[in-house]
Amino acid sequence: MRCPFCGGPDTQVKDSRPSEDSSAIRRRRVCPDCGGRFTTFERVQLRELVVLKRSGKRVPFDRDKLQRSIDVALRKRTVDPERVERLVSGITRRLESGGEGEVTSEAIGEAVMEGLKGLDDVAYVRFASVYKNFREAQDFQDLLGTLGERLEGEGDLPEDGEAAPAPPDEVVAAPRRGRPARKRA
């Protein structure tokens, strides 16, 4: 493999191990010419997928683009990167093993929405607003209504097993942090 730093033709593998979910092999490499160190990931590709876009254009499937779109939806959300990687790998595997060499952009979008719905509600709404091209507030209200119905049907505990937040009328103000206020004389 060519060195990304100096362009040297050969690099040496120093360490090789499977990723957490065994969907990829992580390799640490070093360049003998410049001493640069970098990491590569090797993944199994079941078949070459072609994405059929809404415009009718055909483009090669890009796993990195899928990862980036999910990362954008999850920006500033505290979701474990391993869970995100499992989601991306699962969607990719499902698409590759679907039997068809071509997959529609709609099928990819629906798979991402389904995955985000189980991962993070805010990211789900963000992605849906772009994917479904929301134009007005009513579009958000409709989506939030279906999301609320889903949450009501799950019972008292959210998916992660933590206690549900208190309803707004039962919220108690948190104690102040820092030094206590001085009494004025």
From Swiss-Prot:
GO biological process, one term: negative regulation of DNA-templated transcription
Pfam families: ATP-cone, Zn_ribbon_NrdR
Ranges where the record places region Disordered: 1-24, 149-185
Record-annotated ATP-cone domain positions: 49-139
InterPro entries per record: ATP-cone_dom, NrdR-like_N, RNR_NrdR-like
Segments of skewed composition (Basic residues): 176-185
Names of required cofactors: Zn(2+)
Classification via PROSITE patterns: ATP_CONE
Zinc finger (unnamed) in chain: 3-34
Keywords: ATP-binding, DNA-binding, Metal-binding, Nucleotide-binding, Repressor, Transcription, Transcription regulation, Zinc, Zinc-finger
Biased composition (Basic and acidic residues): 12-24
GO-annotated molecular function: ATP binding; DNA binding; zinc ion binding
Cofactor note: Binds 1 zinc ion.
Family: Belongs to the NrdR family.
HAMAP family attached to this UniProt entry: NrdR (MF_00440)
Protein task: Negatively regulates transcription of bacterial ribonucleotide reductase nrd genes and operons by binding to NrdR-boxes.
Name this protein carries in UniProt: Transcriptional repressor NrdR
Species assigned in the record: Methylorubrum extorquens (strain PA1) (Methylobacterium extorquens)
